[in-house]
């Protein structure tokens, strides 16, 4: 989590820069926005598991933070360094796939995961400056199975 305030990303990236750790991919999401969407989904289904006051307290607290996910060239060192200066960091296994930048390839990957019974917890991606390919990061329910499906990490 990252404090939702001006300059916080600069502080975090300064720490990584000073340790010669490169960020290769990153996603930042407003924690409050995410939780509000979840709250609204729960309202529609009627499956709230806690009193309304509990949800409202969490929403109020979440307004102070953003969720940040990033890939570095040295994840273990990044976790150690950031934890040592007070950030709460968790290492997660993800799979990175390079897709040719054309319609339908992300669908092919998503369909392959679904057909194999692999759930996608989250994904984020962006095109490379060459305009030919894009990198997508996936957090999936069955990492080993996903790696077997796409062993070279390139989808053409």
Where are these regions (language model features)?
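A conserved regulatory-domain signal marking ACT and ACT-like small-molecule sensing domains
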Residues: 1-156
């Amino acid at each position: 989590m990252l404090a939702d305030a001006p300059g916080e990303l600069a502080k975090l990236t300064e720490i990584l820069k000073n340790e010669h750790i490169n960020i290769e991919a990153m996603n930042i999401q407003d924690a409050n926005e995410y939780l509000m969407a979840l709250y609204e989904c729960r309202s529609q289904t009627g499956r709230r598991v806690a009193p309304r006051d509990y949800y409202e307290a969490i929403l109020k607290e979440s307004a102070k933070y953003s969720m940040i996910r990033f890939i570095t060239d040295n994840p273990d060192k990044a976790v150690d360094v950031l934890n040592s200066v007070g950030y709460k960091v968790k290492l997660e296994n993800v799979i990175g796939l390079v897709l040719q930048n054309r319609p339908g390839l992300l669908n092919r990957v998503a369909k392959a995961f679904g057909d194999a019974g692999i759930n996608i917890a989250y994904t984020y991606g962006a095109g490379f400056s060459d305009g030919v390919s894009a990198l997508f990061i996936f957090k999936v329910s069955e990492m080993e199975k996903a790696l077997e499906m796409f062993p070279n990490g390139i989808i053409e």
